[in-house]
UniProtKB/Swiss-Prot annotation:
GO terms for biological process: fatty acid biosynthetic process. InterPro entries: 4-PPantetheinyl_Trfase_dom, 4-PPantetheinyl_Trfase_dom_sf, ACPS, Ppantetheine-prot_Trfase_dom. This is Holo-[acyl-carrier-protein] synthase. It is found in: Cytoplasm. GO terms for cellular component: cytoplasm. Keywords: Cytoplasm, Fatty acid biosynthesis, Fatty acid metabolism, Lipid biosynthesis, Lipid metabolism, Magnesium, Metal-binding, Transferase. It catalyses: apo-[ACP] + CoA = holo-[ACP] + adenosine 3',5'-bisphosphate + H(+).
Length: 125
């Protein structure tokens, strides 16, 4: 089992979004993630939460974004109950037998995410 955590200031995300617009979002989010976030009452908080979630996942993997896993190798959407769910889009980037769980929260100033990598089989990812 591995964990990763990330925290992001909402103001930082808001500045980048105001400056670069959709181009900023397209750097690290899939189209479904963008649509989900922009439909929320507080899009900046949702965008920051997704950013933190993606950072937490790569920290749990121990690779970082430049270590073979890219921003769009996976997406963070919601299930029917509203819980965030990680979907692996490029499974070749991820070790076999891994399941990733994610939790996201935010307040007026920041968003935080924690990722937990679990193994379906014995051994390491």
């Amino acid at each position: 089992m591995e964990i990763g955590v990330d925290i992001v200031e909402l103001e930082r995300i808001e500045r980048a979004h105001n400056r670069y617009g959709r181009k900023f979002l397209e750097k690290f989010m899939t189209q479904p993630e963008i649509e989900l976030c922009l439909a929320k009452p507080s899009p900046v908080a949702s965008i920051a939460g997704r950013f933190a979630a993606k950072e937490a996942v790569v920290k749990a993997l121990g690779t970082g974004i430049s270590g073979g896993v890219f921003w769009k190798s996976f997406e963070v959407l919601n299930d029917s109950r509203g819980r965030p769910v990680v979907t692996l889009l490029d499974k070749a980037c991820f070790p076999p037998g891994c399941v990733i769980k994610i939790s996201i929260s935010h307040d007026r100033h920041s968003a935080i995410a924690a990722a937990l990598l679990q193994y379906k089989t014995r051994g390491r990812c």
